[in-house]
Regions:
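C-terminal regions of mature proteins
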Residues: 522-554
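Short, surface-exposed beta-strand/loop "edge" segments at domain boundaries and coil↔beta transitions
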Residues: 134-140, 171-173, 191-193, 270-279, ...
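Short, structured motif recognition centered on aromatic/hydrophobic residues
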Residues: 55-56, 124-129, 181-185, 366-371, ...
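An internal, short helix-loop-strand segment that often contains or flanks glycine-aspartate motifs
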Residues: 75-109, 146-261, 288-289, 331-334, ...
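Structural boundary/hinge residues at secondary-structure and domain interfaces
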Residues: 7-15, 19-164, 211-240, 263-366, ...
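Active-site proximal loops enriched in glycine and acidic residues that flank catalytic Cys/His/Asp
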Residues: 268, 305-307, 371-373, 451-453, ...
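Short, Lys/Arg-enriched N-terminal segments with co-localized hydrophobic residues
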Residues: 1-3
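Composition- and surface-driven signal marking solvent-exposed, interaction-prone regions
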Residues: 196-198, 267-269, 278-281, 316-318, ...
Length: 557
């Protein structure tokens, strides 16, 4: 009996030990999984300094690299070199993945790149979450591919360690490691700013404007780009005026790829009372469909604005530097008269375009702005009356008068042309100052046409009369097919052709595209802003044109 009791006690002790062991293992596993989960949820935006101008985010780094490699432009070796960090990552990415038998951890697939002023390929920071074992993997990888000519150095910054690694091309990479994340940059000062942002809790996520806009990554999106749309440089670097446009506040763009195109679908929540491009568009009633039947077939740039609220539009455009460059009391008065004329007779949209003339020796392209009018006959009578009572400008700069060239464009002969007193209406909406603010006008089938020279009007009317229009062409249909039929502003531009034009004709295209001309000249770019219930939806589409692009020389002004 005594021996039986001993066996029972031993059996109970063994069972209790097993239960305790299982319980302990379960608690350990739970704590371990909880720690991993916490590491997964680490918000990299709490590291980004508040002066960042843009941030690229992905939680599918491997998929993003695969998508980029699948683009036809990548296969043709056309790459956008805006970040040396991304170039290095792309260069060594397959090797890094090869060092991990099961691919990158879920945490390492989460990556940010923040962009900072000045906008150069070296002024970025790359951030990456780290999972279990990732710290050792990354440290080993960095040491493996850094130069052995110089030893790595370590610096203390406010109690945190910054490591400096020499690279094989003679540069130095600054890195900040923790068990949860890493941050690397070619600029040590940017890593110092990352440490400051993290420790002081003054990161991008601590800014109300960004935090309100940020909603986390969406599903089925390769990457998201967050852009601070403040003062944006426009046109070419060689433009003496160096125009800038105040677009608005933060916007986020979800990126998707196919072989022939890159699609960026955006949203901008922020609203204020500033005279910005986006705020001006918010006050307009959207327009429907596109105007390919009113565009000559040789068009390489066009845009279309909704102008139901002219005060808002001209309140914004009148602030542009090129509109104020030659301002005077006389011009100011003419602008006021034209504002009243437009309020009375203009419809709800205006379109402008650049296209090639039949004369291949022309140094400048043809440029026309087309304003829909409510009643063409009444509007023309009002214009004639306005011209009759307008006083002559004293001391106006001498400008050679241009002529319609009806011999080359005979079908434009029956549409009367007018030379207007100097004003900035055309300049405000196109950026063109070539004619010293002199403008030519003509009425054509329900529209008022404005141009910096008479021949542009003739060439435009002649093309439309002959049915030589853009509508139905493959490039045009592909471009508009990627956009919404309802919008407040839309623009399409063949960047190869645009780069050939003088400075005064390209001021509506962001300078970013010209600074990276080696890449963007291979694309047709479509940009669209749609507004609904106070929210603005900007969209950007890059359509690859392929390899058949001729060499060109940029034309100076």
């Amino acid at each position: 009996m005594y021996a039986m009791k001993i066996r029972i006690l031993i059996r109970i002790a063994v069972i209790v030990s097993i239960v305790l062991l299982c319980t302990g293992f379960g608690v350990y596993s739970f704590l371990r999984m909880n720690a991993v989960e916490n590491r997964q949820d680490f918000n990299l935006f709490t590291l980004v300094p508040q002066d960042a101008t843009a941030v690229l985010e992905t939680d599918r780094m491997a998929d993003l690299m695969e998508d980029i490699d699948g683009l036809h432009c990548s296969k043709d070796e056309h790459f956008l070199y805006v970040s040396e960090l991304f170039v290095c990552l792309k260069k060594y990415f397959n090797t890094l993945v090869g060092d991990t038998p099961h691919g990158l951890s879920r945490q390492m697939n989460k990556m940010l790149i923040s962009f900072h002023e000045p906008d150069t390929p070296l002024n970025q920071v790359l951030y990456c979450s780290l999972g279990a074992g990732d710290y050792e993997l990354v440290e080993s990888f960095v040491r493996k591919y850094c130069s052995s000519t110089f030893p790595s150095k370590y610096f203390d910054y406010n109690g945190e360690e910054i490591r400096i690694y020499p690279t094989t091309d003679g540069r130095f990479l600054a890195a900040y490691f923790t068990p949860d994340f890493l941050a690397v940059s070619f600029q040590k000062r940017l890593i110092e700013q990352v440490i400051d942002a993290c420790r002081s809790r003054q990161s991008l996520m601590d800014m109300a404007s960004f935090r309100t806009m940020y909603a986390g990554k969406r599903n089925n999106v390769a990457a998201t780009v967050y852009v601070r749309m403040k003062e944006v440089g426009m046109g070419k670097n060689t433009d003496g005026i160096r125009p800038q446009t105040h677009l608005g506040s933060w916007a986020e763009f979800d990126m998707k790829f196919n072989e022939e195109a890159v699609y960026c679908s955006g949203i901008s929540h922020g609203a204020d009372t500033a005279r910005t491009f986006i705020n001006a568009l918010r006050r307009q009633e959207p327009i429907k469909d596109f105007s390919g039947e009113r565009l000559p077939a040789s068009v390489f740039f066009y845009n279309q604005w909704a102008i139901s609220d002219l005060e808002a539009i001209f309140g914004f455009t009148s602030q542009q530097e090129y509109a104020k460059a030659a301002y005077s009391d006389y011009i100011k008065k003419r602008d006021g008269e034209w504002m009243e004329f437009m309020k009375t007779y203009a419809g709800e949209n205006v379109m402008s375009c650049l296209f090639h003339s039949k004369d291949t020796t022309d140094r400048h392209p043809c440029a026309v702005m087309s304003v829909a009018v409510k009643d063409e006959a009444q509007a023309e009578r009002a214009l004639q009356k306005l011209l009759y009572v307008t006083p002559e400008e004293k001391g106006a700069p001498a400008v050679e008068r241009t002529y319609p060239n009806y011999r080359r464009y005979p079908r434009a002969r029956k549409y009367r042309q007018y030379m207007l007193p100097r004003n900035t209406v055309l300049t405000q909406l196109t950026g063109i100052t070539e004619s010293a603010l002199h403008t030519y006008a003509c009425f054509y089938k329900g529209t008022l046409l404005l141009a910096p020279d008479a021949q542009s009007l003739s060439a435009y009317v002649d093309a439309l009369e002959n049915g030589d229009v853009l509508d139905g062409t493959s490039v045009y249909e592909e471009g508009v097919g990627s956009l919404s039929p309802y919008y407040n502003f839309a623009m399409m531009v063949d960047m190869e052709e645009m780069m050939r034009q003088p400075e005064t004709y390209v001021r509506l295209v962001p300078n970013f595209f010209f600074r990276h001309s080696d890449f963007f000249r291979h694309f047709t770019i479509a940009i669209q802003f749609t507004c609904a219930e106070g929210v603005v939806y900007p969209n950007l589409v890059l359509l690859y044109k392929g390899e058949k692009i001729g060499e060109f020389e940029e034309i100076g002004n």
